[in-house]
């Protein structure tokens, strides 16, 4: 790669009319994050010292969504073409740096391809990313003289002969800052669209005797843009297939790769098994021998060795120690923590709660703002009543406690080690060690009772 300092310009001013959306086009998500964020991440990984983001439609929403202090925001008040967009950013270019031009709606461009492009840029020339298509209709054609790139002709301006060319311009290029500023100043809009084309600088460079090096991406999907939701869905499919392939080759068993979604990053150990229709969001860590059942959603969580998550469970911002079992149909909300061997069964919800070693909450339970010790049994239908209408309060349960079914723990309350709470109890006061607590209404029997009969 060139040893020059480098800036990146990302064009993101388009309205995205064909998306039929109030959201700026580049904020539509692919794999769980805005398209333009994929491009920003690639720019950072390729070594950009400065990133200039050219925006127009929905600028306030763009800035509030991306929240990236490292970006230089450049307004393009009128959308008069790619050359015009680059002219808005040109005052920020240094003469001695390389400037790489990218697009906010071309989300799958790879760092490897960008590195190859930058390395191929000739001294004083231009590095240009091109591809060959079976059907190049609608794209700017690459013209060559004696095999060397000499210019780009937009489809609407191309002759019948030029339209037979199948090598097309992707729009991605890199050039020296001083050269780029000089060429941009010479652009005019004397063309069928009445716009300022960045592509015109290729002919300018050729006429100055500069070399233009054409580089091809590793995959066509890297340079495919998004103009409508169908194209976005297709790129999502491509991206997910690539991620699934990488995971399979790294030893993760995806039972159905076509029904797996990665919307973030996944670190994993050995012998991990993931069933169909699982969604991974944010930053997730899976230990060795973790098994995840069908239909689960795992988000921003760490799951230890030998854990098993049964089907249709949701785990978000949670921490699981080794050998924990979850679900089916369990929900771990932010702040949930399970220690070694803990079990959370079906229709159990936890939030800001810790379940100790070997403790179990088998079914139909809510545990919120709770600290639960080791070897505790939480009976079906138990609820920690943590909210009084204004503030949240904590429930503390010691080791070896037995909580019977249909128990309500009205926080703040503490249950000491070894206590037993009988089924159907409402706990409103602290319980001492090894106490039995029950608050049942006396059971009444009425012999020969007859139910009321409806009047006809």
Curated annotation (Swiss-Prot):
EC numbers, comma separated: 2.7.7.23, 2.3.1.157
Cite the residue spans of the region called N-acetyltransferase.
251-456
Region Linker, residue ranges: 230-250
Q: Which InterPro entries match?
A: Bifunctional_GlmU (IPR005882), GlmU-like (IPR050065), GlmU_C_LbH (IPR038009), Hexapep (IPR001451), Hexapep_transf_CS (IPR018357), MobA-like_NTP_Trfase (IPR025877), Nucleotide-diphossugar_trans (IPR029044), Trimer_LpxA-like_sf (IPR011004)
Task: Write out the annotated subcellular location.
Answer: Cytoplasm
Recite the UniProt keywords alphabetically.
Acyltransferase, Cell shape, Cell wall biogenesis/degradation, Cytoplasm, Magnesium, Metal-binding, Multifunctional enzyme, Nucleotidyltransferase, Peptidoglycan synthesis, Repeat, Transferase
- The residues that hold acetyl-CoA are 380, 386-387, 405, 423, 440
Concerning SUPFAM superfamilies, the annotation shows:
Nucleotide-diphospho-sugar transferases (SSF53448), Trimeric LpxA-like enzymes (SSF51161)
Positions contributing to UDP-N-acetyl-alpha-D-glucosamine binding? 11-14, 25, 76, 81-82, 103-105, 140, 154, 169, 227, 333, 351, 366, 377
Which pathway is this protein assigned to? Nucleotide-sugar biosynthesis; UDP-N-acetyl-alpha-D-glucosamine biosynthesis; N-acetyl-alpha-D-glucosamine 1-phosphate from alpha-D-glucosamine 6-phosphate (route II): step 2/2; Nucleotide-sugar biosynthesis; UDP-N-acetyl-alpha-D-glucosamine biosynthesis; UDP-N-acetyl-alpha-D-glucosamine from N-acetyl-alpha-D-glucosamine 1-phosphate: step 1/1; Bacterial outer membrane biogenesis; LPS lipid A biosynthesis
Under the GO molecular function aspect, what terms does this record hold?
glucosamine-1-phosphate N-acetyltransferase activity; magnesium ion binding; UDP-N-acetylglucosamine diphosphorylase activity
GO terms under biological process? cell morphogenesis; cell wall organization; lipid A biosynthetic process; peptidoglycan biosynthetic process; regulation of cell shape; UDP-N-acetylglucosamine biosynthetic process
Q: Which domain of life is it from?
A: Bacteria
Q: Does the keyword Magnesium apply?
A: yes
Binding residue positions for Mg(2+): 105, 227
Enumerate the active-site residues.
Answer: 363 (proton acceptor)
Query: Chief localization class?
Result: cytoplasm
The cofactors required by this protein are: Mg(2+)
User: According to its UniProt record, what is one Pfam family this protein matches?
Assistant: Hexapep
Entries under PANTHER family matching the protein: BIFUNCTIONAL PROTEIN GLMU, NUCLEOTIDYL TRANSFERASE
Question: Which NCBIfam families does this one have?
Answer: glmU, PRK09451.1
Provide the assembly information: Homotrimer.
**UniProt function note:** Catalyzes the last two sequential reactions in the de novo biosynthetic pathway for UDP-N-acetylglucosamine (UDP-GlcNAc). The C-terminal domain catalyzes the transfer of acetyl group from acetyl coenzyme A to glucosamine-1-phosphate (GlcN-1-P) to produce N-acetylglucosamine-1-phosphate (GlcNAc-1-P), which is converted into UDP-GlcNAc by the transfer of uridine 5-monophosphate (from uridine 5-triphosphate), a reaction catalyzed by the N-terminal domain.
- Record's protein name: Bifunctional protein GlmU
Gene that encodes it: glmU
């Amino acid at each position: 790669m060139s040893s020059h300092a480098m800036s990146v310009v990302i064009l993101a001013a388009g309205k995205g009319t064909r998306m039929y959306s109030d959201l700026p086009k580049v904020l539509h998500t692919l794999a769980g994050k805005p398209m333009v964020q994929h491009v920003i991440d690639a720019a950072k990984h390729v070594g950009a010292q400065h990133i200039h983001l050219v925006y127009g439609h929905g600028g306030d929403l763009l800035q509030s969504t991306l929240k990236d202090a490292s970006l230089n925001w450049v307004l393009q008040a009128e959308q008069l073409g790619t050359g015009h967009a680059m002219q808005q950013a040109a005052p920020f270019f240094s003469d001695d740096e390389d400037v790489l031009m990218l697009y906010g709606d071309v989300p799958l461009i790879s760092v490897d391809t960008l590195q190859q492009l930058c390395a191929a840029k000739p001294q004083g020339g231009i590095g240009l990313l091109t591809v060959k298509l079976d059907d190049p209709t609608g794209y700017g054609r690459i013209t060559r003289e004696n095999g060397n790139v000499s210019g780009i002709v937009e489809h609407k301006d191309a002759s019948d002969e030029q339209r037979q060319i199948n090598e097309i311009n992707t729009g991605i290029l890199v050039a020296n800052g001083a050269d780029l500023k000089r060429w941009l100043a010479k652009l005019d809009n004397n063309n069928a669209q009445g716009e300022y084309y960045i592509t015109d600088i290729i002919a300018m460079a050729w006429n100055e005797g500069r070399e233009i090096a054409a580089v091809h991406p590793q995959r066509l999907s890297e340079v495919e843009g998004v103009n409508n939701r169908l194209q976005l869905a297709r790129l999502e499919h491509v991206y997910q297939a690539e991620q699934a392939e990488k995971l399979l080759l790294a030893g993760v068993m995806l039972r159905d790769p076509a029904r797996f979604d990665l919307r973030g990053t996944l670190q994993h150990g050995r012998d991990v098994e993931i069933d169909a229709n699982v969604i991974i969001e944010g930053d997730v860590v899976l230990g060795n021998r973790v098994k995840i059942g069908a239909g689960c959603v795992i988000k921003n969580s760490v799951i230890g060795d030998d854990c098993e998550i049964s089907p249709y469970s949701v785990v978000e911002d949670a921490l699981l120690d080794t050998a924990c079992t979850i679900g089916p149909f369990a929900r771990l909300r932010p702040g949930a923590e399970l220690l070694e061997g803990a079990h959370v069964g079906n229709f159990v919800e936890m939030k800001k709660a810790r379940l100790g070693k070997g403790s179990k909450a088998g079914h139909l339970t809510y545990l919120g703002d709770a600290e639960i010790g080791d070897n505790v049994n939480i009976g079906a239908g138990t609820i920690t009543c943590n909210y009084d209408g204004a503030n949240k309060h904590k429930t503390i349960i010691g080791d070896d406690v037995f909580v019977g079914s249909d128990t309500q723990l009205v926080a703040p309350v503490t249950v000491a080690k070894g206590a037993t709470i009988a089924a159907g109890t409402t706990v409103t006061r602290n319980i001492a060690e090894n106490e039995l607590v029950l608050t049942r209404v006396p059971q009444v029997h009425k012999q020969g009772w007859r139910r009321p009969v409806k009047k006809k």
